[in-house]
Amino acid sequence: MKLEADEVTKRYGDFQALAGACFATGSEARVVALLGPSGGGKSTLLRVLGGLLLPEAGEVRIDGEALPHEPAAALAVLRRNGFVFQGYNLFPHLSLQENITLPLCEVHGQNASAAAARALELLERLGLAEHRHKRPAELSGGQQQRGAIARALAPRPRLLLLDEPTSALDPVMTGEVLDVVRELAEGGQQIVLATHEIHFARHVADWVVFLAGGRVLESRPAADFFREPACDAARDYLGGLSRYR
């Protein structure tokens, strides 16, 4: 996939989260990692790329197709994508399987039997079939996040967008989730990932977009970025993260 952003601006009140962000990935990029310090704009850019937020200015293109700013058209784009956040966002009163089937039926218009079959397929794929009747509170953090990934994959999304999916997990649970994401990437799923997990990004990403202060400072193949970052901010960021690892 080829992702492009031209002078994208997004504000939250007086705070400018994206300040004319510009970048383009290579068309060969399959997994794009958004990296940078906290507050740099990663999560906001991820939401704009997925159609979850509309920018005040600028344009985003995916494989040459400009994302619309008109709300109804933007909603159609949003429904083509899948999102996973650090807080899981599973419905606490529903079983794991129901968390997957409900959006398939209510949002995507599938019938109950097709939705149940798709849910079971994904739960088996992600090692969760035996837990399908449990509610989120009965699952570990890693299981809940894998369930959230299954729900995001259920409608066969064009893009899977992951926003800090492991930041609330311990190392064992993090490993569970990262294994799943790696398998998805190897299977051809197009992924945009905002993360501080540099070790994982180094091994799974094809392309890195580095942000700080709401601006994109680097957009390069991942191997080039990790071998020799071009800007001081990226060098300082990578050096700070690796100092105690």
What annotation goes with each model-predicted range?
Residues 35-37:
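The feature captures the beta-strand-to-loop junction immediately N-terminal to the Walker
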Residues 154-158:
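A short, proline-enriched helix->beta-strand linker immediately N-terminal to the Walker B motif
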Residues 160-163:
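Catalytic Walker B motif of ABC-type/P-loop ATPase nucleotide-binding domains
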